[in-house]
């Protein structure tokens, strides 16, 4: 079990969540490829039911819990509990993480996650960055979808106001640290005065690595925050690597229920409501988003 080995070995809970993911994938594949060479028959309903059976019979009774801000003594902001899943060295006491990898510099097992991210690297091959469409997928705190065509979002800082806490945890924004001594600050550039005066007046601006070179350059303006240890100064890192979480099982269950036409308040209470509560987002019944790029798919 997860509790026996603190999530450091493959365990029953992780196997359950993996089974749910596989069944959801296969069911979705057969349903949406029905009648093509990729799916000669459609047993999707059977697979979706299997996902829910795994949830009802095994996952929910397993005693796993989401890592919440309210129960985290170190949390001060709404996004802190979610962030802690990805920027901590030790996840032994966080039951939401059912399977993870531990690093120890003393034992010669380490990574360079914060070292890379703090320098602007998210891809070791070429310059990169998180997409605007990903950022737009995060809800407002009142549970409504964002209107990406709103002119106010031309201001970088407006993008993060009154938004899902997971967006704040995932994307670098004003006030975030790249590492212990590197604070990000974005504001409108003051173009008045001479070149020297402009340089002096704007020296407090620290962009999300837009001015980097090669793989150290961010090309979208949205830089990954998850995985950054803000106590990092230099050298190698011990940031833990999450491989499976309880939240994944909740999402699988909710999606399978929606595919079966069985998504209701009871399902929401067990799945999406607690996830959104942690993110500081008011739960509202899923509805069609007029700006959703994949029109035709169910909203839940």
Predicted regions and their residues:
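C-terminal substrate/ligand-recognition segments
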Residues: 160-277
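An aromatic- and glycine-enriched ligand-binding surface/loop that stacks and positions planar moieties
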Residues: 9-13, 21-204
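Aromatic-anchored glycine-rich loop motif in surface-exposed flexible loops
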Residues: 1-12, 19-46, 217-242, 253-300
């Amino acid at each position: 079990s997860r509790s026996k080995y603190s999530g450091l070995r493959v365990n029953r809970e992780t196997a359950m969540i993996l089974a749910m993911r596989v069944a959801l994938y296969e069911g979705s594949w057969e349903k949406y490829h029905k009648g093509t060479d990729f799916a000669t028959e459609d047993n999707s309903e059977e697979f979706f039911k299997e996902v829910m059976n795994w949830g009802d019979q095994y996952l929910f009774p397993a005693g796993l819990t989401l890592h919440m801000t309210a129960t985290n003594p170190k949390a001060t902001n709404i996004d802190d509990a979610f962030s802690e899943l990805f920027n901590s060295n030790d996840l032994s006491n966080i039951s939401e993480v059912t399977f993870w990898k531990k690093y120890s510099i003393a034992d010669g097992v380490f990574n360079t996650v914060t070292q890379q991210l703090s320098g602007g690297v998210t891809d070791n091959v070429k310059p990169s960055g998180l997409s605007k469409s990903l950022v737009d997928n995060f809800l407002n705190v009142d549970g409504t979808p964002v209107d990406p065509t709103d002119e106010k979002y031309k201001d970088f800082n407006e993008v993060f106001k009154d938004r899902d806490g997971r967006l704040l945890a995932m994307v670098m924004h004003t006030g975030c640290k790249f590492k212990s001594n590197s604070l990000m600050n974005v504001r409108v550039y003051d173009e008045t005065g001479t070149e020297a005066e402009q340089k002096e007046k704007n020296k407090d601006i620290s962009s999300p690595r837009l001015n980097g070179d090669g793989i150290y350059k961010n090309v979208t303006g949205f830089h990954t925050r998850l995985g950054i240890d803000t106590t990092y100064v230099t050298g190698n890192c011990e940031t833990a690597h999450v491989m499976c979480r309880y939240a994944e099982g909740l999402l699988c269950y909710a999606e399978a229920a929606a595919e079966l036409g069985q998504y209701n308040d009871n399902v929401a209470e067990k799945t999406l409501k607690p996830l959104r509560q942690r993110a500081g987002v008011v739960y509202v019944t899923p509805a069609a988003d007029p700006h959703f790029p994949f029109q035709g798919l169910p909203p839940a």
